[in-house]
Each structure stands twice: as C-alpha cells, then as structure tokens.
Amino acid sequence: MQKRTIPRRTFLKETLAGTTLLSLSSVLPSELLLADELSQVPKDLVFFSPKEYLIFEAVAERIIGQPSPGQPSTKEVGVASRADQFLAGADAEVQDQLHQLLTVFNSPIVAFLFDFRFSSFLNMSAEDKDSYIRDWMTSMFGVRRTGFQALKRISLSMFYTDSRSWKEIGYEGMFMPEDRK
C-alpha cells in the first residue's frame, strides 16, 4: 500500500476547516421547530434528538429521491427511525461526531459561510437542499466531503436493507429452497 502524502498547506487548511466546523456546532443557535413537524417525530427515539431526526429524515429523502410509482418512500420504509436504532449501538465517539455533523449540516451560519445561503437545511426548498448536498459532496474541504459520505452511506444502507425497497432495484431477495420461502 502506497503512503499518501498531503502537502502541509492542504493539511493545515483542512484541519482548520474541520476544527472551525466542530467548534461552531456547539454554539450555534437552535431553531424553533413547528408543532406539526414535532408531532411527526416518533417519541421513542434512542439516538437522535427530535431536531436531528428531522434533519436526517430530510437528508435521506433528498439523497434517495422520490420512489417510482408503487414503491415505498423513505418515510414509509422508516429510514430515519431505522438509523436511530442502528446508531444507538454505535461507538460513543461515532455518536458524538454524528450529532455534531447534523448540527453543522443544518446550521444557517455554516450554510452562509461556505455556500452564501441564508437558511438552515430544514428551511431550504427541495432544489436548494439538493444543491446544498451537492456542495457538501464536491467541497474543497475534506471534512465536508467526509460528512456527506457518512450521511449518504447511512441513508442508503437504512433504505436498501429493507426488503420493501428491493423491487425498485430489481433484487428479488435471497434464493431459498421452495419450502423455505
């Protein structure tokens, strides 16, 4: 395996960007959520706060996209609820990083500083959400690209490990002997 060398300037810029993002996440003002949005959040959350649940649900919906007719949506599959259960068993350090990532991702301050947007992710239009996610995916800062990859992989794995989503991708499930189906 070849050792990857990073120029000092790149290392310093990425370290500074990552430190800034993580520092901001702990002091960002919390938005007030509407009562109807909160009423849709399950009461039995284990990992996510109600706000984080809404953020992750919105991210997963934009990453996975609209289903074909007759196929389940991210809400019907319960992607955010499944992620909540899955992440509850994750390592404490991973949990802390995901809480910070969701806070930073939804922050209007971070959106303004990096993308000149004046809104939190939850308050953006569908088109702006897609563009914002794309900005994270293609960012010059490795910490943002890594954050995007984390959100994408969790979203996709929670959606496509549910058997209701298999038909859309042409997967029929495991081949089992006829008597075990």
Regions found by a protein language model. Give the residues of each.
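N-terminal secretory signal peptides and thylakoid transit peptides that target proteins
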Residues: 1-22
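C-terminal segment of N-terminal export signals and the immediately downstream linker at the start
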Residues: 4-5, 26-61, 180
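Generic hydrophobic alpha-helical segments
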Residues: 18-22, 66, 158
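Residue-level marker of structural boundaries
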Residues: 20-21, 28, 138
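Short, polar/charged, Gly/Pro-enriched helix-capping and turn/loop motifs at alpha-helix termini
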Residues: 25-26, 165
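Short, N-terminal intrinsically disordered low-complexity segments that are rich in Pro/Gly
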Residues: 45-49, 68-73
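Mature-region segments of soluble proteins
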Residues: 55-61, 70-181
